[in-house]
Amino acid sequence: MLDIKDIRLNTEEYKRRLGTRGVKPEEIDELVAEDKKRRELLVETENLKKERNEVSEAIAQAKRNKEDASEQIQAMRKVGTKIKELDEKLAKVEENVKSMAAHLPNLPNPTIPVGPDEDSNVELYKVGTPRKFDFEPKAHWDIGEDLGILDFDRAAKVSGARFVFYKGLGAKLERAVYNFMLDEHAKEGYTEVIPPYIVKSKSMYGTGQFPKFKDQVYQVNGEDMTLIPTAEVPLTNYYREEVIPTEDLPVYFTALSPSFRSEAGSAGRDTRGLIRMHQFNKVEMVKYTKPEDSYNELEKMTKNAGNIMEKLGLPYHVITLSTGDMGFSAAMTHDLEVWMPAQDTYREISSCSNCEDFQARRARIQYRDENGKLQYVHTLNGSGLAVGRTVAAILENYQNEDGSVTIPEALRPYMQGLEVIKKEK
């Protein structure tokens, strides 16, 4: 949620910067006009309530003096009726203001690239050199099916498209990957959390998924409950409507969870493999920080995600997303993309974002500054990493000509020392 007062004071600045995110100028004008109406109604209501209190005192004084107070009583009834009407009108206007503001994305950091889509993203740096194969590299779905460790066909029979069964060493590899990730994040000071996988709408609102993206999640019929699209939701709402003790900041959380996504609007994209699923495991990182520390913490979070890939020996690069490609709640986002040999390109495996105080305003998460004044914290979130995509990257980057897959050294302790996944005879 953006600061309505700041929008009012810097309207043209908000039009310009939010315009780079597809927000039309009239949306800002309508919000400012509705907020003006809200403030005018508030003043009018408060004045009438003050008048009612004065009349009430006059009636009490008249009764003490045993004087006729019928005129004052009649006047107070009229004032009371008017106040009730204004309160109802004010409630509707306040709801309009809240709804209009809730649909506005976060203000982009002024240093990020401006552009309508991913073509405007800017590469920051590369790590690792893509392997040169002396044979034609296969796609991870073919590797997994040939080895008997991934079964997409039976998953489609059971659940439909965009699901998978991990089997045998495939399941063990997935488990090894996320246990390795959690252990690495623990070394960096993250507290491991096992969160709820179903949350209330208020939690989805707090992180910015609701109300704008309700069609992209799975909701429980007849209940105010939603399957989480990411552990960011429960982890960021952990301190909702609380004041975090200043001495506890920064707070680092990490969690493994399934993520459930309807993938609305993704028809025809990544229809095969582990890249775009309705259900997938992801290790998430979430931070609560003081405002002055948040961008330094974003760089550290990006490094934390990158370190996982470096220890797994996976080539990747880091890009800064443009204003038009960035997520709704983010002020700045660094995407980490891993090299996928069969596709001959980099694919997103982690997205690390600084949401500044956008989510904290929606979820009312605060701390006290050095003067004891309540301030909103800054929240950050990042994938550390998407587990299925990491498995896909390992299968493609570590494949051998005979169809086997070498296990990265960092994962072997989690695989009981196994070095190669081979097809069972």
UniProtKB/Swiss-Prot annotation:
GO terms for cellular component: cytoplasm. One of its GO terms (molecular function) is catalytic activity, acting on a protein. Its EC number is 6.1.1.11. The keyword Calcium does not apply. PANTHER family: SERINE--TRNA LIGASE, SERYL-TRNA SYNTHETASE. It is found in: Cytoplasm. Keywords: Aminoacyl-tRNA synthetase, ATP-binding, Cytoplasm, Ligase, Nucleotide-binding, Protein biosynthesis. Catalyzes the attachment of serine to tRNA(Ser). Is also able to aminoacylate tRNA(Sec) with serine, to form the misacylated tRNA L-seryl-tRNA(Sec), which will be further converted into selenocysteinyl-tRNA(Sec). It comes from Ligilactobacillus salivarius (strain UCC118). HAMAP family: Ser_tRNA_synth_type1. The gene is serS. This is Serine--tRNA ligase.
